[in-house]
């Protein structure tokens, strides 16, 4: 029974911290895995050109969906702080208003994605051969942006509601839906990239609509959906708090576009396909760190709101050690699995397989420091300091990485592209440490 009674107000041991964050970690990993399934089916059943096309437009798709991460993480920090201050009714109203705002914004962005997809595909560097698949896949997937955003929002709010296991269940349900429909639409019906896009969109509906139904009905969680009018101040505060998550998403997408541009210039279509494989695997590995950050953030926000300084120190100290252990473990695992994972995606093409395996063994060193940097950004989001969180995220995912992608190939050739992300993580680690030291007296976590 003790394992089922963890509350935001508790003192967290290593075991309790891991148990509380495990559902969100599993949720993010499973979300990443079922996203990877699209790539596996498209690469193996449709071909490497459609696979490259999907990878080319994916950064744009993720930018739109990233708005949901911004609202979810920033809104959860605000709502959890209100709960810590004992303002239950205001927490309900803020939660409800943010869900309504997500629905409205998602509908607008869905329309924008559908209308602009041909121009976006061409801007991203799609070749004539890739263009039809880019537009077809992109238009279908962005049509479901409203559902994607809702899914991302509820992933965070389930934790603030003290229902992380229910969040995991919803994610698994969405993932199984995507996997089954991918197999049916691509392997059986032979619908190609359209099948992959439809499968993804329908799975996002499962992930976004099921939580909506749950929170609309009487439930045992800390949060309820109530009639609510849009209020500018909490919307701006939530978006400000979560701006680092949006910045990370946008920056990663922009850098992804830069990677693709450099690879098309230096290697060609095979380079984009190899990078796509690295991104799919990175999604899964980094999802562990993101899941921990999402899972622990409401705890940090609650204790910040309650002014429990000793618990903030405890959470930071334990989290830093867990991120270090996770970084070493994932780096070793990535080195060992480089060849098998590359073979799984592109084993049908010997030269592409060799390129991907080589790139993987250079790329994997980035996992050593990624966890700490992701947690540091999320930690400041949880403290309702969106500016510092966004600065860490912006420098890590855009400035340092974009600079490395441009400069390192000049010094190291093509290998410089694969080393770029590790270079960015090293610089981000330094910046994260500086901010933690500078802000220690304000938040009393050291």
Regions found by a protein language model. Give the residues of each.
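Short alpha-helical transmembrane segments in multi-pass integral membrane proteins
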Residues: 1-21, 79-146, 188-243, 300-366, ...
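Transmembrane helical elements of multi-pass membrane transporters/channels
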Residues: 19-38, 140, 151, 174, ...
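Hydrophobic transmembrane alpha-helices of multi-pass small-molecule transporters
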Residues: 63-66, 178-183, 208-212, 283-287, ...
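Hydrophobic/aromatic residues in alpha-helical transmembrane segments
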Residues: 38, 75, 116-117, 154, ...
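Helix-terminus/linker motif at the lipid-water interface of multi-pass membrane proteins
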Residues: 33-51, 121-128, 184-191, 253-284, ...
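Small-residue-rich hydrophobic transmembrane alpha-helices
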Residues: 51-111, 148-167, 274-338, 370-392
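Short runs within selected transmembrane alpha-helices of multi-pass transporters and secretion channels
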Residues: 72, 140-159, 170-178, 196-209, ...
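N-terminal transmembrane alpha-helices
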Residues: 9-46, 59-74, 78, 82, ...
């Amino acid at each position: 029974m003790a394992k089922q009674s963890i509350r935001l107000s508790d003192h967290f041991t290593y075991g309790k911290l891991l148990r509380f964050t495990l559902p969100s970690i599993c949720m993010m990993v499973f979300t990443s895995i079922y996203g990877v399934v699209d790539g596996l089916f498209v690469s193996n059943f449709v071909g490497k050109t459609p696979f490259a096309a999907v990878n080319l437009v994916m950064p744009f798709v993720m930018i739109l969906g990233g708005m949901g991460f911004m609202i979810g993480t920033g809104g959860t920090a605000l709502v959890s702080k209100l709960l810590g201050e004992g303002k239950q009714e205001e927490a309900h109203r803020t939660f409800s208003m943010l869900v309504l705002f997500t629905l409205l914004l998602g509908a607008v962005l869905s329309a924008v994605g559908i209308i602009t997809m041909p121009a976006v595909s061409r801007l991203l560097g799609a070749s004539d051969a890739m263009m039809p698949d880019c537009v077809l896949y992109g238009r279908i997937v962005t049509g479901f942006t409203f559902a994607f955003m809702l899914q991302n929002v509820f992933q965070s709010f389930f934790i603030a509601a003290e229902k992380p296991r229910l969040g995991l269940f919803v994610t698994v349900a969405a993932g199984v839906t995507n996997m089954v429909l991918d197999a049916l639409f691509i392997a059986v019906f032979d619908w190609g990239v359209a099948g992959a896009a439809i499968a993804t969109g329908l799975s996002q509906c499962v992930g976004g609509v099921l939580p909506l139904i749950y929170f609309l009905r009487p439930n045992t969680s800390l949060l309820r959906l109530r009639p609510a009018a849009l209020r500018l101040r909490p919307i701006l505060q939530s978006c400000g708090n979560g701006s680092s998550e949006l910045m990370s998403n946008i920056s990663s997408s922009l850098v992804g576009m830069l990677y693709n541009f450099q690879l098309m210039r230096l290697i060609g279509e095979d380079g984009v396909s190899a990078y796509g494989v690295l991104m799919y695997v990175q999604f899964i590995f980094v999802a562990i760190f993101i899941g921990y950050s999402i899972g622990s953030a409401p705890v940090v926000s609650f204790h910040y709101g309650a002014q429990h300084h000793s618990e903030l120190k405890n959470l930071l100290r334990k989290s830093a050690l867990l991120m270090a252990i996770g970084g070493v473990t994932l780096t070793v695992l990535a080195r060992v699995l480089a060849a098998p994972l590359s073979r799984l995606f592109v084993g049908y093409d010997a030269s592409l397989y060799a390129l991907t395996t080589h790139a993987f063994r250079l790329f994997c060193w980035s996992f050593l420091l990624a966890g700490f940097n992701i947690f540091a950004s999320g930690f400041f989001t949880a403290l309702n300091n969106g500016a510092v969180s966004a600065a860490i995220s912006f420098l890590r995912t855009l400035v340092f990485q974009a600079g490395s992608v441009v400069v390192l190939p000049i010094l190291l050739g093509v290998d410089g592209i694969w080393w770029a992300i590790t270079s960015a993580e090293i610089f981000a680690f330094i910046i994260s440490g500086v901010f933690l030291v500078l802000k220690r007296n304000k938040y009393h976590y050291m």
